[in-house]
Curated annotation (Swiss-Prot):
This is Acyl-[acyl-carrier-protein]--UDP-N-acetylglucosamine O-acyltransferase. It catalyses: a (3R)-hydroxyacyl-[ACP] + UDP-N-acetyl-alpha-D-glucosamine = a UDP-3-O-[(3R)-3-hydroxyacyl]-N-acetyl-alpha-D-glucosamine + holo-[ACP]. Gene3D superfamilies: Hexapeptide repeat proteins, Udp N-acetylglucosamine O-acyltransferase, C-terminal domain. Its EC number is 2.3.1.129. It is found in: Cytoplasm. Disulfide bonds: none annotated. Keywords: Acyltransferase, Cytoplasm, Lipid A biosynthesis, Lipid biosynthesis, Lipid metabolism, Repeat, Transferase. Pathway: Glycolipid biosynthesis; lipid IV(A) biosynthesis; lipid IV(A) from (3R)-3-hydroxytetradecanoyl-[acyl-carrier-protein] and UDP-N-acetyl-alpha-D-glucosamine: step 1/6. It comes from Shigella flexneri serotype 5b (strain 8401). Belongs to the transferase hexapeptide repeat family. LpxA subfamily. It comes from the Bacteria.
Amino acid sequence: MIDKSAFVHPTAIVEEGASIGANAHIGPFCIVGPHVEIGEGTVLKSHVVVNGHTKIGRDNEIYQFASIGEVNQDLKYAGEPTRVEIGDRNRIRESVTIHRGTVQGGGLTKVGSDNLLMINAHIAHDCTVGNRCILANNATLAGHVSVDDFAIIGGMTAVHQFCIIGAHVMVGGCSGVAQDVPPYVIAQGNHATPFGVNTEGLKRRGFSREAITAIRNAYKLIYRSGKTLDEVKPEIAELAETYPEVKAFTDFFARSTRGLIR
């Protein structure tokens, strides 16, 4: 169904069964598949392909040659009706690719809201990207990667499958991330190693001086105390009782399966 207030360019192809919301704009030479839902106010500039069982929310801007919901590159994929879900107010720039999930990975590739995906970024099957994240030009997420809120992935950086990038992380450009990056950390290199706390980013987002100090103390326990992670976990949990921002570390430890960058 195409809402009567939506605009569809005469050269675009919207297949029967697709849903186009109010005030959406489907530009020249775009292709929208039969199981696609485009939300209110979302704009497909031109030459955009949206395929598969894909749901895109409101007020997104999707630029030319982006491909969303296409068959993933997992060799086990056998055509199952897996999905892509994208939230609201994202800017998805030229030639970005976002692939549908796999049955083995839960069947869903999910992108939240208010993200900037720069030119040529790739989000593989079963990835989860939170809110207000930035993937710079040519950043690549392998399958099953999780990127938490406010994380920034630098240009030409590759993240290994199943890795977790914590909230407020800054990964420098041209890096290779092979293990999990705890929240608030700056990471750089191939393989990526930690370079302290992203204090400038936290200041910009309104973290108090006391909270930043507590986060830095937790970082020092993990990386500079000479103790094992199991040894510092109780100390970090105790610190989190006073400073709720530190709880992001304890929650992260519970999710981590690949070990932390060192």
